[in-house]
Amino acid sequence: MLFLKSSRAFSKRLFSSSTVRYRDIQRLTLTGNLTKDVERLQSQKGNEYMRYTVASNNGKDVAPTFHSVYVFDSYNFDRLQTILRKGTRVYVEADAVWRSVPAGNEGSQAKMSLRHVSADVLFYPRNKNGDESGEETHPELDADPMINSF
């Protein structure tokens, strides 16, 4: 009985009963394939930024989830434009940014955007035709793509 009582007290100390707020959830980790080459865009105010989309899923029979990630650090633009190509399997870390967006008669809704922190290439796309497509291929990585386990 003593053990049961102490384990309950211990579990109560580990569990927080405070409410979760949007600002409490910040960093997301994604693995998946890029749906197209990274895009270099310009805002209405003339600021340059980039956008890429990662498709991820939890198995072959599950529909993919698409995540748009935005890059605002112009220092990385050229490097990212070189390595982030359509079909590349990537590991991405991004910060979740929440903002209010007007929703018509209902008031406003919270919308989440993903701000790029880092991206690592796991696999480059395979060149199935054997022709020179300009994309970098790695024959040693020709194994079937791994299933996303996240």
Swiss-Prot record:
Residues 1-22 form a transit peptide. It is found in: Mitochondrion. One of its GO terms (molecular function) is enzyme activator activity. Keywords: DNA replication, DNA-binding, Mitochondrion, Transit peptide. GO terms for cellular component: mitochondrial nucleoid; mitochondrion. Residues 127-150 are annotated as: Disordered. InterPro entries: NA-bd_OB-fold (IPR012340), Primosome_PriB/ssb (IPR000424). Residues 128-141 have a biased composition (Basic and acidic residues). GO terms for biological process: DNA replication; mitochondrial genome maintenance; positive regulation of mitochondrial DNA replication. This protein binds preferentially and cooperatively to ss-DNA. Involved in mitochondrial DNA replication. This is Single-stranded DNA-binding protein rim1, mitochondrial. It comes from Schizosaccharomyces pombe (strain 972 / ATCC 24843). The gene is rim1.
